[in-house]
């Protein structure tokens, strides 16, 4: 009898162990999938998965951090900060992870205009870690928002000194442009152009810089050189150059080539939709937008969804435009342009927003 009871207990123990092991494996898969979805731009799904990981107690600090990043991408900055605070309060937060979380929290504080809190995090990072180009740039952004122009300039110079790339020059230029200080940012673009192009990527990057400077002739020259060396991304940007020059015929050709050659044609479909809108062919524009949405992610998805609103408005289908604007703001709640557009559309369809 004792032997039978022992056998039964062992069976229960084994079953419990297998169940726990199965749950543990499932939780681990969920956590890994969350990281993949975050990387792929599936932010709402990633957020749900990270919240599941938090509830299961799986890598708490990392899960809170992941949820915070997903919230940031969705424009929910205060919720992001809450997650970052929770992550920092966890028992086991490695030095490298803490640096990462503080950087994200500072960026989130910047978004909600909590400049003092953002600068406090930047100062903590400067005191506790070796500064790199990203931290210098972030500190410069915060200082610029606080109208501390000398401090901002010093940090931007350090950032570019650490990372004298075309991307960094464009990033600094964009920060100054937002403050209507374009001249201060242009010198970084000029510094980037002082380098000699060595390959197709360099020609593409130089084309980008010239495009931001609205020097379309030089932009086109550089992009054509990149295209001659099989740089596919240059096709889409050259299409935008032609659009800005009001040459929609050549623009359409570039976007069509991009769709046929790129691994993900979303950017090309978006460009074709712009050409259709220019021609007044709104049904074709919607068709191209629909094709683009099927494969788009990140910023390109946002641009496609924005253009979809515009097309319905151009078609005078204000009811659908209103619906699309409301759906858009659920994904990108910080977009002030669409918020204004939503208010206009409500007047067109006589809808009162009960949430306001």
Locations of regions flagged by a protein language model:
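Start-of-helix register in tetratricopeptide repeats
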Residues: 28-29, 62, 96-100, 134, ...
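Canonical tetratricopeptide repeat
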Residues: 66, 73, 97-104, 138, ...
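Terminal, low-structured helical/coil segments at or just beyond the last alpha-helical repeat
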Residues: 310, 314-356
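Residue-level recognition of tetratricopeptide repeat
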Residues: 35, 69, 107, 141, ...
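Register position in tetratricopeptide repeats
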Residues: 39-40, 73, 111, 145-146, ...
């Amino acid at each position: 009898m004792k032997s039978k009871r022992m056998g039964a207990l062992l069976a229960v123990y084994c079953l419990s162990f297998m169940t726990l092991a199965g749950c543990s494996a499932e939780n681990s898969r969920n956590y890994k999938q969350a990281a993949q979805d975050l990387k792929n731009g599936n932010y709402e799904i990633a957020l749900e998965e990270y919240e599941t990981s938090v509830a299961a107690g799986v890598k708490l600090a990392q899960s809170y951090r992941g949820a915070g990043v997903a919230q940031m991408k969705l424009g929910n900055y205060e919720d992001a900060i809450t997650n970052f605070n929770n992550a920092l309060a966890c028992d086991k937060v490695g030095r490298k992870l803490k640096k990462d979380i503080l950087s994200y929290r500072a960026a989130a504080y910047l978004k909600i205009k909590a400049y003092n809190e953002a600068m406090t995090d930047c100062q903590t990072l400067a005191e506790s870690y070796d500064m790199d180009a990203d931290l210098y740039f972030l500190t410069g952004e915060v200082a610029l928002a606080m109208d501390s122009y000398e401090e901002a300039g010093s940090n931007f110079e350090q950032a570019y000194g650490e990372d004298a790339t075309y991307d960094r020059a464009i990033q600094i230029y964009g920060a100054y442009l937002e403050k209507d200080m374009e001249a201060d940012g242009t010198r970084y673009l000029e510094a980037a152009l002082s380098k000699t192009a060595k390959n197709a990527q360099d020609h593409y990057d130089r084309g980008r810089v010239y495009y931001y400077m609205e020097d379309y002739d030089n932009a086109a020259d550089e992009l054509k050189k990149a295209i001659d060396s099989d740089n596919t991304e240059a096709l889409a940007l050259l299409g935008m150059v032609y659009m800005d020059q009001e040459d929609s015929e050549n623009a359409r050709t570039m976007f069509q080539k991009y769709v046929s050659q790129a691994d993900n044609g979303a950017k090309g479909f978006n460009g074709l939709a712009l050409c259709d809108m220019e021609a007044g062919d709104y049904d074709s524009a919607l068709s191209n937008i629909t094709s683009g949405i099927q494969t788009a992610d990140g910023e390109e998805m946002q641009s496609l969804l924005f253009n979809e609103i515009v097309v319905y408005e151009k078609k005078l289908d204000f009811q659908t435009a209103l619906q699309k604007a409301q759906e858009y703001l659920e994904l990108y709640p910080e977009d002030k342009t669409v918020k204004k557009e939503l208010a206009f559309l409500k007047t067109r369809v006589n809808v009162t927003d009960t949430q306001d």
